[in-house]
Amino acid sequence: MDHLPIFCQLRDRDCLIVGGGDVAERKARLLLDAGARLTVNALAFIPQFTAWADAGMLTLVEGPFDESLLDTCWLAIAATDDDALNQRVSEAAEAHRIFCNVVDAPKAASFIMPSIIDRSPLMVAVSSGGTSPVLARLLREKLESLLPLHLGQVAKYAGQLRGRVKQQFATMGERRRFWEKLFVNDRLAQSLANNDQKAITETTEQLINEPLDHRGEVVLVGAGPGDAGLLTLKGLQQIQQADVVVYDRLVSDDIMNLVRRDADRVFVGKRAGYHCVPQEEINQILLREAQKGKRVVRLKGGDPFIFGRGGEELETLCNAGIPFSVVPGITAASGCSAYSGIPLTHRDYAQSVRLITGHLKTGGELDWENLAAEKQTLVFYMGLNQAATIQQKLIEHGMPGEMPVAIVENGTAVTQRVIDGTLTQLGELAQQMNSPSLIIIGRVVGLRDKLNWFSNH
């Protein structure tokens, strides 16, 4: 970390801007909004500065820069179009032990100005460390669209309630659950926006006085196939609100880095032929943590209801009366095929898709005759160890040996690897790949050479 993000209290503190043009004006607006006692020094000023001075909002010092202007300052900004002058201001500020920002010259500055999302009292600052201001601006714009304009009013109102909430709810967990209910209550937010005092009071009393459910809950979240950018917005919200995250091997490190920092993390990863934690024990972990009153996220790669055993885990919770919900994820078949340039359906080649597990419970047998039919795409999950059997069975039941096949390893991740060939080569191809891998069989695989976009990135 090259810069420490801090929020400075500048109200009624002396600050200096050197420069009287448009760039200096933008910086001045920020300092004035923060309540700074502002002095602006320049040889000439644009009209806005004169208007501010006439209104008593700042002091103008016309003339060359003099180091004595820094004597009482807490903070300075060099915002002229003269690089040498900006450097002199920076060096003088350094000698005075005053933080100084130099516009468009982060290496000459002792602090940099972030992109700001202002929902006062809630403030969000985004910075690229001065390396890419455009990137910081794009991120700010994206965050602006996610944060409602009335969020500041809700945050300010929450500050007024802190004392009462502390008296009403004895434990930290109870208080956190109350605040989470308040911040997502649309009626309260709208009432604050409309300054409807009656509705504000009614909604607040309802939230404070309704009984808190001391039972925990479990949210089954699909993490998607690997690329953290494919995690859904709702999935992200859930892992950032969790007390406990129970996760498996298919959840990438990039996604785990998004988990709430103080959440407990329980790894229950599985590998082909080896279960780190038996399924029954996983069920009991979810049950045990929820019974402690915790918010538990069961985080699974792909989609939890597609070969994720999510249904089995939820049955245990249902039988115990534990509340639960499900956040779907992008399943591996969809993600891996898209990132490999293989459309699962195509008007000319495939009118249906079969998602098939590569291993069944003891005694299970697939309907190989129907699987060998034309005009469909087959996607085998967890089928790497059974690739030779899949090849044999499909050919025995009439699928042409020249049918295109592909195996996708670590789909959608930067380490994705794809190998393709024909059905007669499937067993041999599988020996060159590692788990997790997905097998795709069908005429659509032949489009890969034309549609493969991800490897070019």
UniProtKB/Swiss-Prot annotation:
Role of this protein: Then it catalyzes the NAD-dependent ring dehydrogenation of precorrin-2 to yield sirohydrochlorin. Finally, it catalyzes the ferrochelation of sirohydrochlorin to yield siroheme.
Coiled-coil residue windows: none
Catalytic machinery residues: 248, 270
List of residues that carry Phosphoserine: 128
Region (Precorrin-2 dehydrogenase /sirohydrochlorin ferrochelatase): 1-204
The keyword S-adenosyl-L-methionine is assigned to this record: yes
Name of the gene: cysG
Protein name: Siroheme synthase
Catalytic activity: uroporphyrinogen III + 2 S-adenosyl-L-methionine = precorrin-2 + 2 S-adenosyl-L-homocysteine + H(+); precorrin-2 + NAD(+) = sirohydrochlorin + NADH + 2 H(+); siroheme + 2 H(+) = sirohydrochlorin + Fe(2+)
Binding residues for NAD(+): 22-23, 43-44
Organism name: Escherichia coli O17:K52:H18 (strain UMN026 / ExPEC)
Family note: In the N-terminal section; belongs to the precorrin-2 dehydrogenase / sirohydrochlorin ferrochelatase family. In the C-terminal section; belongs to the precorrin methyltransferase family.
InterPro entries: 4pyrrol_Mease, 4pyrrol_Methylase_sf, 4pyrrole_Mease_sub1, 4pyrrole_Mease_sub2, CobA/CysG_C, NAD(P)-bd_dom_sf, Siro_Cobalamin_biosynth, Sirohaem_synt_dimer_dom_sf
